[in-house]
């Protein structure tokens, strides 16, 4: 199944959804932030370095109101 999205981690935080996903097993995972009502279009760019530590830091940033700073990256 080419281009099938596999969600590796997902967390709902303060009206947002933080997802770590990849298109297929040979692709590196990416992290993206969405609003809960629109899971089709991310509100910040996909993060290239997608690992558990980066995921946790992004979840914390969203939870503590630093979403604007993430958008500048």
UniProtKB/Swiss-Prot annotation:
It comes from the Viruses. This is Putative gene 60 protein. It comes from Bacillus phage SP01. The lineage of its organism: Viruses, Duplodnaviria, Heunggongvirae, Uroviricota, Caudoviricetes.
